[in-house]
């Protein structure tokens, strides 16, 4: 078995070794948070593999929290949108978060955020100095992150082949995958792959809503496209997505529901994994206080600060006070509220090494917002979860966590101290959740090739072959009536109706002839 794996690894990676020289690769990250972290990891992996990588990113913005920065071995090109745009964009995004966390989220608020992203994209495309510099670099490949449509337009403007990385759930973007609606849940449906009759009805109807939303979201970039692309060469975003040579998906079937894929679609869930380091001594000392009881890790992601919502903050703090475990809570509070007494078993920190803590032998539970990177890290280390999904793909992610039985979720609007404490105790006391999380970890780790090897191997394959046309089905070039066999259906329907009409005519003629023959016989 080990010999087979070595042969498979050599056969997959050898073409990359045979490349005559390192490729020049541009990675583009226009938003921050977990999206930036994933693109940073991709850039570093490819740089370590021997390619010359340059990352283009926006210095700061509403998506860009303060991260603990590390020295980069790849080149970074940063730019800034005008100050007035940044201020207005931040207001829009803060309003989006406030409304969403308050249970008043609307699709129009998301469209407003996308409109600011489109305007930010226009500001960048107007930067002739940067665009000329990128063109002069003559990159071999561009790698885009898909939360924002702008990287697709930049790649198109540069005229270079590009690879897309989807950092969130599958269904949040339509890029040509088959969607059998009987068992592949549509994004936002909150369904599993096991649907009853009414579930399939809901899924079928929501598919049309999903398609309409995609059109509305893409339309926010219409003005940007008209401004920066000449008539006759203006890309259609839905078509531009299909031009990607490869699609890397930040997921794994240890977490996601099984579904059909295309040859140019590659799972790389677990890409964020790094060698485990000892946790900082102050955290180790805190963990040691609770002995065999262990500790609970709490973080609600990089874009949301729980301390900004006092009610959520108080309910969570009260829930943690009921636990015998210690609680390490990532909560960026410059000042702890004077009217709230911090639970004795809780330690709050502005920053923490999440992966290292998830790998700690004393961890008992992970309380998470349900972000894709966080869930994949928890699965890697076999840690069960309680999810408090906030927005975006997070509710869909927690549906999968619950379906796979390595965690439960609580709706934000129903978050109460008693409910949260009960859920946490349920997960820690019922060993089936831990067993399911460990089983998922085994699935994730037992691939013949690691996520890094898959990423590097497939990119080297595309670089060597000059593209991935051989991996793309002809359906991408077919008109919609051919894709769905409507022309065949109309032909067969016409043939059937024509045959029935002809049979009816012949039958009528036969009846007329028989009647005529009878009258002749009677006379």
UniProtKB/Swiss-Prot annotation:
TM segment ranges: 484-504
Pfam families reported in the protein's UniProt record: UDPGT
Residues on Cytoplasmic side: 505-523
Protein location: Membrane
InterPro entries: UDP-glycosyltransferase (IPR050271), UDP_glucos_trans (IPR002213), UDP_glycos_trans_CS (IPR035595)
Enzyme class name: transferase
Reactions that this protein is recorded to catalyse: glucuronate acceptor + UDP-alpha-D-glucuronate = acceptor beta-D-glucuronoside + UDP + H(+)
Membrane-protein topology: Single-pass type I membrane protein
Coiled coil regions in record: none
Entry EC number(s): 2.4.1.17
One GO BP annotation of this record: cellular response to genistein
Extracellular side: 23-483
Residues in the signal sequence: 1-22
Keyword Metal-binding: no
Keywords (A to Z) from UniProt: Glycoprotein, Glycosyltransferase, Membrane, Signal, Transferase, Transmembrane, Transmembrane helix
Keyword Iron-sulfur tagged: no
Family membership noted in the UniProt record: Belongs to the UDP-glycosyltransferase family.
Role noted for this protein: UDP-glucuronosyltransferases catalyze phase II biotransformation reactions in which lipophilic substrates are conjugated with glucuronic acid to increase water solubility and enhance excretion. They are of major importance in the conjugation and subsequent elimination of potentially toxic xenobiotics and endogenous compounds.
Protein name: UDP-glucuronosyltransferase 3A2
Protein source organism: Homo sapiens (Human)
Phylogenetic placement of the source organism: Eukaryota, Metazoa, Chordata, Craniata, Vertebrata
């Amino acid at each position: 078995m080990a010999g087979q794996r070595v042969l498979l690894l050599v056969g997959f990676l050898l073409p990359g070794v045979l490349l005559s020289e390192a490729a020049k690769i541009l990675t583009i990250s226009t938003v921050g948070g977990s999206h930036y972290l994933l693109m940073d990891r991709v850039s570093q992996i490819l740089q370590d593999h021997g390619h010359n990588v340059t990352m283009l990113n926006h210095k700061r913005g509403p998506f860009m929290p303060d991260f603990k920065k590390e020295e980069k071995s790849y080149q970074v090109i940063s730019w800034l949108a005008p100050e007035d745009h940044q201020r207005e964009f931040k207001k829009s995004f803060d309003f989006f978060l406030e409304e969403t966390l308050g249970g008043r989220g609307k699709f129009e608020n998301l469209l407003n955020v996308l409109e600011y992203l489109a305007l930010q994209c226009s500001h960048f495309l107007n930067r002739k100095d940067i665009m000329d510099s990128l063109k002069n670099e003559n990159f071999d490949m561009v790698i885009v992150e898909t939360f924002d449509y702008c990287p697709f337009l930049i790649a198109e403007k540069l005229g270079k082949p590009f690879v897309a990385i989807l950092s969130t759930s599958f269904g949040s973007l339509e890029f040509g995958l088959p969607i059998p609606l009987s068992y592949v849940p549509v994004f936002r449906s909150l369904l599993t792959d096991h649907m009853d009759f009414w579930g399939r009805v809901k899924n079928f109807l929501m598919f049309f809503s999903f398609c309409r939303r995609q059109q509305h979201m893409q339309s926010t970039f219409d003005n940007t496209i008209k401004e920066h692309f000449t008539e006759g060469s203006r890309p259609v975003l839905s078509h531009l997505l299909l031009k990607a040579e490869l699609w890397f998906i930040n997921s794994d079937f240890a977490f996601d529901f099984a579904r059909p894929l295309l040859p140019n679609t590659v799972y790389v869930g677990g890409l964020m994994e790094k060698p485990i380091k000892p946790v900082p001594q102050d955290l180790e000392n805190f963990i040691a206080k609770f002995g065999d009881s262990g500790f609970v890790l709490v973080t609600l992601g990089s874009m949301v600060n729980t301390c900004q919502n006092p009610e959520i903050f108080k309910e969570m703090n009260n829930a943690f006070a009921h636990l015998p475990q210690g609680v390490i809570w990532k909560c960026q509070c410059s000042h702890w509220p004077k009217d709230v007494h911090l639970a004795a078993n809780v330690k709050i920190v502005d920053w923490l090494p999440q992966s290292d803590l998830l790998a700690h032998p004393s961890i008992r539970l992970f309380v998470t917002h349900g972000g894709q990177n966080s869930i994949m890290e928890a699965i890697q280390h076999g840690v069960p979860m309680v999810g408090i999904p906030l927005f975006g793909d997070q509710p869909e992610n927690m549906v999968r966590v619950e379906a796979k039985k390595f965690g439960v979720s609580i709706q934000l609007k129903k978050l109460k101290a008693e409910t949260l404490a009960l859920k946490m105790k349920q997960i820690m006391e019922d060993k089936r959740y831990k067993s399911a999380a460990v089983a998922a970890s085994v699935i994730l780790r037992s691939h013949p090739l690691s996520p890094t090897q898959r990423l590097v191997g497939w990119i080297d394959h595309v670089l060597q072959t000059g593209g991935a046309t051989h991996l793309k089905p002809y359906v991408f070039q077919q008109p919609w009536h051919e894709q769905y066999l409507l022309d065949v259906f109309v032909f067969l329907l016409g043939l059937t109706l024509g045959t029935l009409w002809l049979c009816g005519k012949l039958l009528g003629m036969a009846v007329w002839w028989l009647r005529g023959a009878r009258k002749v016989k009677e006379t």
